[in-house]
């Protein structure tokens, strides 16, 4: 069964809009629906924030974890909150699919953070394979994609978003490293699973994560 999404019922997002409007004070709230996409725009003064909800077509690969806002974020936003979130391995696994596919500087910057923290752990790679299996692009186009010119997205959609500036050349190095290392980290079982998936006969027993196996 497909998990419910805002595409089918946007009422939770409207509720979020009301809650945000109370926090935004005199800010303007705009809910935009374009086909299957629903976006919430919050604007106050010269600042605009876009809340874009990802469609959910699956459950989680790993059990969710309850986490508190880190100390620095709590200091900046003068608040303290805890929420159920994806496990780090699943969060990074899904991020790797985006970084390999669309190659947006934001995704590649997150991969840099991954490399600085723990690198490509077996659990992260396993989650990557799970998300790759559910992606809307062919497996080979993600694993062996051509390099996209990052310059326009870097200048127009990335510069100014990070606390410390980072050069485009650094992100290009991270992308090159990821495209070289990630395919090489796939286990024999993961490779056989993906080959079977492409052939229309996936062997789910080759996957170690319990949820995809139990759901198929």
Ranges and model annotations:
Residues 2-216:
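Compositionally biased terminal segments of proteins
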